Amino acid sequence: SAAEAPMDKDIAFENVSFHYGEDGPDVLENVSFTVPAGKSFGILGGTGSGKSSLLLLLCRLYAPTEGKITVGGVDIADMPARYVRENVGVVLQEPFLFSRSVQENIGICGASDAEIRAAAVTACVDGDITRFSQGYDTMVGERGVSLSGGQKQRVAIARMLTKKTPVIVFDDSLSAVDTETDEKIRSALDRDLGGATTIIISHRITTLLDCDNILVLEKGRVSQLGSPKELLAQPGIFRKIYDMQMSIGEEEGA
């Protein structure tokens, strides 16, 4: 039945428009693209581009005003919202951590010790954790160690990895780590994700260059869509932002 159709299939946004409230302005306007199953798909967009709304729609937190979102040809509106959310792992830019041990934060969904450790290694946070006074039993938050933004993001990535969902979304969730760590995490994820469909939302182009395809979203519309190579070869916002970020990167590296 459509109710709990498998979600390890192509995800398609078909002519999706969306606005909040009855007569709010369109946040997304006639957006169409396909995320092939098991591939990595980048979404580049600044503030107000509509990228966060795409995520809210994919997680069934809102419904499109027009158009539909399908997984393997099945409209997600016909699936239980709970089921959709259980199958889409999301790592937010500012993740929520519980005032519990690091171990409990990562294994909140019932992962074994070995799975927790493996996830932390993939998320490049195992080294940090083992340096804490109590290692994985170190408390997080007010009564324990206060984690940096980058450490929080990596703990949240490890937590999401233990869920083993068929779809994974990173919502600017590598923004607080430096470019080198970002690269390390991404290559570890490529190695360990084993067939998950991965959507990476970012404003940092280097984070997206390894994706199979990239969507450039501008003011709620599809501005460009293609492989990184194709987008770098054509004049447009992607190339412009790439050149800008690369020149800033060179100054930082000097």
Predicted features by range, described:
Residues E4-A254:
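ABC-type nucleotide-binding domain
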